Every structure is written in C-alpha cells, then in structure tokens.
Amino acid sequence: MYIEMVDETGQVSKEMLQQTQEILEFAAQKLGKEDKEMAVTFVTNERSHELNLEYRDTDRPTDVISLEYKPELEIAFDEEDLLENPELAEMMSEFDAYIGELFISIDKAHEQAEEYGHSFEREMGFLAVHGFLHINGYDHYTPEEEAXMFGLQEEILTAYGLTRQ
C-alpha cells in the first residue's frame, strides 16, 4: 500500500510516522487492500477545527477526519476497450487505487491518550485504523454498524500489538 504522509505540525517523530505506516499496511492486508493508495496528514486542533467545519459543518476540532474518495466517473468502458488500450486500463487502475485521506489531530491524540489512560502510540494507532476503516466504507451510525466496525478495529489493533494498556 502506498501512503503519503504529511506532518503539518512538525511534532510527529520518525518512529510515529513508521508506526502509522506499518499499522495502516497491516490493516490494508487484513482488508485485502494492499494495492490501494491513501494520504495521512497530521494537523493541529486549529487545523482540525477548520477542516471539520469545512467538510462536516461541525464547529469544533475533532480527532480524525476521514475523506473517502469515491470517483464519479460517468464514462463506461467495457472489457474489450480496456484490452485494446493498455494506457486506458492503466489510467483506470490508478484512478481506482486512491481510496482517500485522513487528517489526524496530534493535539487531540495527546488529549485522548491521557483521558483514556493509554499511550500516545495506542491512540495514534487507534485513530489511524478508525479513519482507515471509514475510508473503506465502514461506519458506526447504527448499533450493528458500530459493533462490526469497532470489533474489526479492536481486532486489528490487538493483532498488531497495540492494546489498551
């Protein structure tokens, strides 16, 4: 999985960037999404607030903003078109590879790690996996969706080795 990482805060260590990369690759493998691409940007609460207002019309900072990329391509190609035109097939493959982007608030991650009594590393892993599941179509609007998403989230974090301790 290709993941573009951007630290707008200047506060994210190389180790934390590496952990985020690794846990997202681990989650991608679990979901069979190894061939996908995404972006992760680490932001401040101020920037998170701006993004939350812009994209979700919510006037406060949040821990992670997940923007799922759903291409709205109206052009239909049949298999023969793609076989006859390798460039078109490659373009369509690249177009389909990008699944979305996450904005993780470093400030919120620190606050929540302290509030929940676990490590900053655990909170960052939680936010990365939570956002990753969102951009892969998981949600928690209903009790059933919440049970499925949170169960999978905990399964990934535990298998990776990021427990609540």
UniProtKB/Swiss-Prot annotation:
Q: Tell me which Gene3D superfamilies the record gives.
A: Metalloproteases ('zincins'), catalytic domain
- Tell me its EC number(s), please: 3.1.-.-
Q: What Gene Ontology terms describe what this protein does at the molecular function level?
A: metalloendopeptidase activity; RNA endonuclease activity; zinc ion binding
Cofactor section: Zn(2+)
* Single biological process term from Gene Ontology: rRNA processing
Residues bound to Zn(2+): 130, 134, 140
> Where does the record locate the signal sequence feature?
none
The UniProt entry, under InterPro entries, shows: MetalPrtase_cat_dom_sf_prd, YbeY, YbeY_CS
The places in or outside the cell where this protein is found are: Cytoplasm
Provide a GO CC annotation, any one: cytoplasm
Q: Name one Pfam family in it.
A: YbeY
Q: How is the cofactor bound?
A: Binds 1 zinc ion.
State the SUPFAM superfamilies in the record. Answer: Metalloproteases ('zincins'), catalytic domain (SSF55486)
The protein's job, in short, is:
Single strand-specific metallo-endoribonuclease involved in late-stage 70S ribosome quality control and in maturation of the 3' terminus of the 16S rRNA.
Q: Which family does it belong to?
A: Belongs to the endoribonuclease YbeY family.
Q: What is the designated name of this protein?
A: Endoribonuclease YbeY
Q: Which organism is it from?
A: Streptococcus pneumoniae serotype 19F (strain G54)
Gene that encodes it: ybeY
